[in-house]
């Protein structure tokens, strides 16, 4: 039996090989939503990703008979560890062929590195921050993936179980929501009208000039995300540098009609207290980008999806309400406002982002829609030492 050789990523060439392995392993998959190569380079580069202000990382590749057969990232998020009082080394960007010796060697590499850094547990899949994809798919392998989540083959969780020592740390659920026809469901409409009248909360759509201009609405939106997501599993607040980074990377591609903000008109400046961001599903377009590249023709597939709205699915990327408003029905305003836009754009169904299985408050907001819980993903953990 051939042995598995572990090599570290040390330069641009080896980083390119690390990134490209996913495209090779998932070539032809009808479910995977591959990331753009340029985005992966940005996220994984220490001189580009603002998360390296408080993170450190090491990337490992597995070779067998001279062939690349797996990859994994080891990440230590110091802010998250301090906040949650844990000594965790995260694993992410994990891919491997169906060979238990390969997966064993990859996880062992991160465990050893984490132990050297004084960590006591390994946990994942997680990224640098909560804005990166997280959780290993354990249900829903024949469902279409989204650009905000990880797709993996069914043998991945089987390897975790076979390797031993791992246990569940957190599960996420995802839902498929059928876009209703013939207007907004009556229940959403009644709640929304009550919320507007009783609490003076109102939906609005920002103009692109407001997002990036003097009003800095984009920054205000991400500040709402920081405050509303702060209690969630593994979350570490975005720094100002990260906010700048996300504004530049993601907001230019968003359709303002699919961004709904909730304002409190009781405040002098109509403060933003809630946000709902959706985007046309990019999965089919990303699958047509050869090895994640926009050139020569990948850009056309992405533009076509974004501008001509050829997809039947809308990805509901983010819903956040400030904690002090979460009991006032403010989330109903988001769907009261966005559902007519979904109908106008011809969307047939929506894909939610990941939701913690214990977050009953979030899951309850789908009860007035025809919905199906169709995916589950898991973060697992394993003790690797006592930190001494």
Give the ranges of each region predicted by the language model:
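Alpha-helical subdomain
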Residues: 48, 75-79, 319, 364-367, ...
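Catalytic cores of nucleotide-enabled group-transfer and carboxylate-activating enzymes in metabolic
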Residues: 12-14, 36-46, 53-62, 69, ...
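Flexible loop/turn segments at secondary-structure boundaries
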Residues: 15, 68, 78-81, 130-132, ...
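Acyltransferase donor/substrate-recognition loop-hinge adjacent to the catalytic core
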Residues: 3-4, 150-232
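Generic start-of-chain signal for non-secretory N-termini
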Residues: 1-31
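A conserved beta-strand-loop-helix scaffold within acyl/acetyltransferase catalytic domains
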Residues: 22-60, 64, 72-82, 205-208, ...
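Acyl-donor binding region in acyl/amide transferases
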Residues: 82-165, 290-369
